From Swiss-Prot:
InterPro entries: CAP-Gly_dom_sf (IPR036859), CAP-Gly_domain (IPR000938), LRR_dom_sf (IPR032675), Ubiquitin-like_dom (IPR000626), Ubiquitin-like_domsf (IPR029071), Ubl_TBCE (IPR044079). LRR repeats lie at residues 149-170, 175-196, 201-222, 226-248, 249-270, 274-295, 303-324. This is Tubulin-specific chaperone E. Pfam families: CAP_GLY (PF01302), LRR_9 (PF14580), Ubiquitin_2 (PF14560). One of its GO terms (cellular component) is cytoskeleton. Residues 27-71 form the CAP-Gly domain. CDD domains: Ubl_TBCE. Residues 337-379 form the LRRCT domain. The keyword Cytoplasm applies. Coiled coil: none annotated. Supercomplex made of cofactors A to E. Cofactors A and D function by capturing and stabilizing tubulin in a quasi-native conformation. Cofactor E binds to the cofactor D-tubulin complex; interaction with cofactor C then causes the release of tubulin polypeptides that are committed to the native state.
Amino acid sequence: MNANVPSDANCRRIICDGEYATVRYVGNVPPTPGLWLGVEWDNHLRGKHNGTHEGTKYFTCSHPTGGSFIRLKKANFGVDFLAALRKRYGLKSEQNEELVIGKKTVELVGFESIQEEQSKLNKLKDVSLRECAVSNAGEKGQICHSCPNIMTADLSKNLFSSWESLAHISSQLENLTSLDLSENKLNPSSNPSSLATSFCNLKVLSLNRTGMKWNEILQCASMWPALEELHLVSNDISLLEQPVNNLQNLTILDISNNKIVDGNQLHTIAFLPRLKQVIVSNNIISSISFPDVDFGHTAMFISLTSLAVNGNNISEWCVINELHKLLHLESLNCHGNPLMDLDKNPETVRQLIIAKIENLKFLNKTEIFPTERRGAELDYRKMFGNEWLKAGGSQNEEFNKPSRDFLQDHPRYSALIKKYGAPDEGELKQQQPFALKNQLLTLTIQCPEKPDKKPIQKKLPDSMTVQKVKGLLYRLLKVPGSDLKLSYQSSKMEGKEIELENDLKPLQFYSVENGDCLLVRW
């Protein structure tokens, strides 16, 4: 083999004319003389064939036009870690240093610059070597000697091809806790547990767009005994398996932008004891359920406080009912699901979700203040009051026996009655339709005690309750979690201020009219 070819060239990653590829063959390709590299391109449009040339199969590609042959001189096999570090951070590699002859020290040219460079390298804690063609650790021991204080390293989109080559780097960085390896194509290790000491302090790992499937992650997981945060975005993952004796310290898992269809796949990770945050946005999930209990709290995800399901296919309220079973769920992000469009008024959807999930404190990254929760729960209790009565509910506790179907559709309704009391008949007779009226009032919103806040004009339905108006104003005015006091001045009764004291009454109850001024105090 040509002396210029790396001994481990096969399966190595290269760059050629700005395109990334993996070497699949090293050797002759008759009748053309000379050495050739058979490569599989990341961009299959760059290739010409599937590894077969003039009837002879030299290598295999995952795409029928993903392969081609190139000359050795066109392949860049990358640089070592320190070379890339010096280049990225503007440091020169000097070879001159002190020379000791007997007992006499001779200072060679460039020694001061070496000391200065070494000082700069020693201070580095967070480094980014993205797209720097890094492929190896370089000379043994040089990394720990030059930059031992690195804690966070971005090595995304480089030329690493094996976990062993990465272990040679990380084993020299004892303080390394966060590592980004996104967009590297890594071959599986034959003995991953033997590399655990090299990654023993690693807490955050990103493997986005690496093509690694979940089963491959589990095969590698013994390498990361202390891992707390794992990012696997855009890896075409469709199936999950239950981790056994690994990933037990995981607190954050990001599997967004994958191809998970069945929400029950999440059951496989439901018993990771420390898992607090799951991000499963932009998959194809339409349902999530926790069948271990019909009502009450599930034994799954016992530590989960935050869930993101943005951009999925969730369209049924039963999914929200299921999420109520998560005892510690405090934050939910669910934008971009069909459910959010079921009612044209996003405020109504928000109120329903808040009422259905008891411990929720943030919805779509917006804080839920106590007054908003109270209003949402009271509105929910009133909105479905007639349905509750028809299903066997009663203001008389002795006869209050709503059907199982009703309780499955509204699992929190009984708790809301215990909290606020049953809705009376008068309340239910005055119940407004589910959809808001078309009668909109143009109101000027003023904060008389906050002169720095400019008046705002807003169109509100006259059927909107005072409580819902308060919820809107909390977000609109970015008011801290204190009680709002609302009143209004009629355009027909100048100087007279009327207090809106009952949160459950609509604006029309107080005869608020078009052009009136809404006064907000806190």
